Each structure stands twice: as C-alpha cells, then as structure tokens.
Amino acid sequence: MRLCDRDIEAWLDEGRLAITPRPPVERINGATVDVRLGNKFRTFRGHTAAYIDLSGPKDEVSAALDRVMSDEIVLNDGEAFFLHPGELALAVTYESVTLPADLVGWLDGRSSLARLGLMVHVTAHRIDPGWQGCIVLEFYNSGKLPLALRPGMLIGALSFEPLSGPAARPYNRRQDAKYRDQQGAVASRIDKD
C-alpha cells in the first residue's frame, strides 16, 4: 500500500524519508511528491559507434560507452536544454532522495508532459530501498517538435510503498551498487554488471 500525502509528510517529519531540499506542502498531493528537473544532462553523440554489444567483453562495452556518451552538460539558470524528436538524453532531478531499507519509491512522469511526447523514464522507475542520491531521468521525445526543458520545472512525481520488512540488502549497503550517491546525470554503467 502506497503512502498517502499525510504519511509522506509524517515520514519526512520523522526523518525516516529524506528529500533535499524538502518539498513544500503544495508539492505533496494525494500519494505523490512532485520533483523538479535539475541542471545536469548527458546526451548521446551521433554515430560514433556502429553499435554497442551489450553482452560483449566489459572493456569493449566500456570503450563504446565512452565514445557515445557526452560529457556532463551543466545549464545555468534560465538556460534550456532542447530535446529533439527521437532523441534520448539523461538528466537528473533537482532533489536528492534518501530511502530507508523498508521503503521503495516509484517515479512517474507527468501526464501533461507525456501528452507532448516526453517520456521521463524509459523503463527504470523503481527507486530501491536504501537509495541515496539524485534520480537520473531517461528522457525520450516521442513527439513531433523539439521540447525546451528548463532546470526547476516540475518533471515527475514520486510515490512510496512500505515493504513487509527492511530489505536484507538495501542499495546503500550493496557492494555492486553502481549508482550509489549519484548527484549528476550518470551514464550507463552496464559494463560494471
């Protein structure tokens, strides 16, 4: 059963759940907390690799990822990131989230943005128990027009679901946690699998 707005506020007040900066009460509604777009992005460089063999040797996968991913792009206040039709880009939430071992989070895009063709997360919308850090967004523009995305705009909503008990292996204690404490638009680390 997901937490309602009153329970989300209580978990925040008690320090069991942390969202930094803490969202104002106007952004905690029903069963979600609205989150904003941060100022860090990453794109894919066009045609710098014929393909990426995801099951290939780790060093080859790593080299291919280095060739296709841009350096992190950091926008200043007032600047826009333009996502063109058919493009995939990574971005990050403005807020950092810390979940306890007995709570899982879910990120959903905003319906108003989806109706313009913007997918906020391509597939990965679960936030593991024990997560700590900003949330990387996997943007895809399936619409017909470029979309201007500006830091600070409302981009998605988080919901939270208590587990039957604390996870034995929460994300922050796993040795193989590839994205622990991420603060930027971290590229795929599939080569670390």
From Swiss-Prot:
Subunit structure: Homotrimer.
Active site (UniProt): 138 (proton donor/acceptor)
Catalytic activity reported: dCTP + H2O + H(+) = dUTP + NH4(+)
InterPro entries associated with the record: dCTP_deaminase, dUTPase-like_sf, dUTPase_trimeric
GO BP of this protein: dUMP biosynthetic process; dUTP biosynthetic process; nucleobase-containing small molecule interconversion
Protein name from the UniProt record: dCTP deaminase
Sites where the protein binds dCTP: 110-115, 128, 136-138, 171, 178, 182
E.C. designation(s): 3.5.4.13
Region described as Disordered: spans on this chain: 169-193
Domain of life: Bacteria
Protein source organism: Cronobacter sakazakii (strain ATCC BAA-894)
